[in-house]
């Protein structure tokens, strides 16, 4: 890490570290960056930043209103979570095609999923659990530790530290690089890290700062502390949505920001690093406000496209006509665009034969296509819904 680049930051200090790098077995003696606790009042921000902050607030309000107008927002939450899961994992270098994720989501055997898809599905499980709980529990290190254990389960990041604040030194940089050559070295494990997390946990409950600004500050601090040995980026971006819900800016987990960030990965990483080097929050808050606005507007458009498709599906239900479980599956396609007879039987509590017959009716009605070409283990997809989700 370029120590000179961090020397002038008034919002943190360099602390000495030494030990054995667990990745290489080599000894190191260097310094890590320890951020000071976040300010209790809004840091000085320029008019150039307050404008996108205001625009983000308006966009989030429109998204929240759109969520309120949907009879079953939980159905729309499903594709939002899975879209976010694919992009947030891609930001960490784990790439899985969206359709592969949805197919694995309904697969009978977990072992059928590739390692990349498994990581994405772990995130889906984590996000659904967190969104179900956030109305009842505040954001805390304990909650995130529970989520972390699920996030890394069965992946290369699964270790004895899964579900616990890390007890090893980690670095951010090219794989295999020396500690001294890392792009960023987070605080060492121990009392300083634990204290920093405690301050962060207390700060995030503070409602005296504009929610958009607060999201930016909290996300930076979480990434700078890097409390876990893996999965910090994915958890940190999930906290963005949880934080907005706790603050009342949103009521449903319909926001996705990682698709926008994925397209600006280097800029995202550079902004985070620059705050640690300079202590200047202004460009970072502006960047995050732009991400929130873009994510909210994309979600609003996605909801509109899906509801339009649902209206078309309802027309097919009426005119074909479709009844019973076939009508239920058709009604839910905007949230479950990939189905199998086994999954449908489980979801709608009917026999395999009834589910299979219902899917055959949807195939005849043109609402589904079979994508495997197999006689057994067939998978059925609504291509229109997939396209609408991916935009």
Predicted regions and their residues:
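FIC/Doc superfamily catalytic core
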Residues: 1-391
